[in-house]
Amino acid sequence: MAHEGCTQLTYIIIAPPEHADEGDRIFRSHRAWMRATHHRDGEKALLSYDLSKVPELSNQLDPNSEPTGNTIFVLSEVYQTYAGVDDHFEQAAATWADFDAMISWFDKCDTTLVPSARILYSLW
């Protein structure tokens, strides 16, 4: 399903080796919390939730280059409208047990956070 006009939240987190396991733990908790709390229909609907994980490479343009030891986590959530993102953040602060742990973990990693962006182009 194409998502043009919907709203995307994207986080890219580069975790040093000593913090990668905490990322795994946080995202397991996050997925369970998302599944239990998020809307599936209407203007607040969560349309997709994807987390990917890969070793960081010394040369990102060369898939055969040596790993740095860091781990890259990429989180993408797509919502029907901005209202879904607003609801997400309100719920996270109020009900997710690991919200503070995630914020603390971000401080230990190299993070790029895009909390709310309109999707311009989308296929299928």
Give a label for each model feature:
Residues 1-74, 78-91, 104-124:
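Short S/T/G/P-rich N-terminal loop/turn motif that feeds into the first structured element of a domain
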Residues 70, 96-100:
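N-terminal soluble domains immediately following signal/targeting peptides that reside
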